[in-house]
């Protein structure tokens, strides 16, 4: 605040409010510093487009709405002054009415200045982080309300990563099955087998592979809602070992410990399952019958 004498009376007014008016006015630098300290920026990065100013009644917007007659009279004055900016016309009006302004009662300018006014504005790179616009607020709220768990992850992760994770156990299972049968063949089946093998015909295995590829293709191009019916993917059976089993059993028949073997769909449909025969005191062996030869007899 600064004290001025108007009409023999001492009055107080904001420091540097009227530069160059009256006898004891402050310098232009002091007035500029005083005005700058009263700016409360609502947007960062040096943008004062939506900034407010500190007044004796709190923060106020710099934008002023005028009535229709006042706006017409004001723009007429601006046109007569020949200035392009409305603020230039306002400054001319304040200087012209300096005597009348000094006669007004003084203001209580003991208000506290904002803490951010004395600090330099942040760089323009931080605009997206500290902006208080409605768009940024809605974006921050949407990010804050987003789920944090990995179970409901992004659509791309659900589409690709889960499919990849589901295919790894299947590949490991297929490799383990092939290794097991290879080890069993090298041992020449010394111990009696006590398990049941369900082999799948080649044409059925091929149709299931086609169905699997079609399911994966539909899952990749579908939406998240449509993929709900396709998830989780159905378990895939191990690869067909039917030709391998036929060749192995034809070379060395295996002993059966009470359970018959069921083999379906031979090559060309010629081979079929046959009941076990009892020989040598109840010993059962697997025998492959040729029904064509049997029909001839």
From Swiss-Prot:
Subcellular localization(s) per the UniProt record: Nucleus
Keywords per UniProt: Activator, Developmental protein, DNA-binding, Nucleus, Transcription, Transcription regulation
Residues in the signal sequence: none
GO MF annotation terms: DNA-binding transcription factor activity; sequence-specific DNA binding
Domain TCP: 46-104
Pfam families reported in the protein's UniProt record: TCP
Feature: compositional bias, Basic and acidic residues: 282-297
Chain residue ranges for the region called Disordered: 116-136, 273-297
GO cellular component terms listed in the entry, alphabetical order: nucleus
Gene Ontology biological-process entries: regulation of secondary shoot formation
S-S pairs: none
Major site of localization recorded for this protein: nucleus
Subunit structure: Forms homodimers and heterodimers.
Reported function: Transcription activator. Binds the promoter core sequence 5'-GGNCC-3'.
Protein name as catalogued: Transcription factor PCF8
Organism from which the protein derives: Oryza sativa subsp. japonica (Rice)
Lineage: Eukaryota, Viridiplantae, Streptophyta, Embryophyta, Tracheophyta
């Amino acid at each position: 605040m600064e004290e001025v004498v108007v009409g023999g009376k001492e009055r107080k007014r904001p420091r540097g409010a009227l530069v160059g008016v009256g006898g004891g006015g402050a310098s232009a630098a002091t007035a500029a510093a005083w005005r700058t300290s009263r700016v409360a920026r609502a947007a960062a990065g040096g943008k004062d487009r939506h900034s407010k100013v500190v007044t004796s009644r709190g923060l106020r917007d710099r934008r002023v709405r005028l009535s229709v007659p006042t706006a017409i009279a004001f723009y007429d004055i601006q046109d007569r002054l020949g200035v392009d900016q409305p603020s230039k016309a306002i400054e001319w009006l304040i200087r012209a009415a300096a005597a009348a302004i000094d006669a007004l009662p003084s203001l209580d300018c003991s208000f506290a200045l904002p803490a951010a006014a004395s600090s330099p504005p942040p760089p323009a790179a931080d605009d997206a982080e500290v902006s208080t616009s409605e768009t940024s607020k809605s974006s921050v709220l949407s990010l804050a309300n987003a789920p944090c768990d990995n179970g409901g992850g992004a659509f791309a992760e659900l589409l690709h990563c889960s499919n990849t994770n589901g295919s790894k156990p299947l590949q490991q299972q297929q490799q383990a099955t092939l290794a097991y049968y290879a080890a069993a063949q090298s041992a020449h089946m010394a111990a009696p087998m006590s398990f049941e093998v369900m082999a799948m015909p080649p044409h059925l295995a091929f149709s299931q592979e086609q169905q699997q590829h079609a399911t994966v293709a539909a899952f990749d191009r579908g939406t998240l809602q449509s993929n709900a019916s396709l998830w989780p993917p159905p378990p895939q059976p191990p690869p067909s070992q039917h030709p391998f089993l036929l060749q192995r059993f034809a070379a060395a028949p295996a002993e059966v410990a009470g359970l018959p073997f069921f083999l379906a769909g031979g090559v060309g449909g010629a081979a079929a399952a046959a009941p076990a025969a009892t020989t040598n005191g109840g010993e059962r062996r697997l025998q492959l019958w040729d029904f064509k030869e049997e029909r001839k007899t």
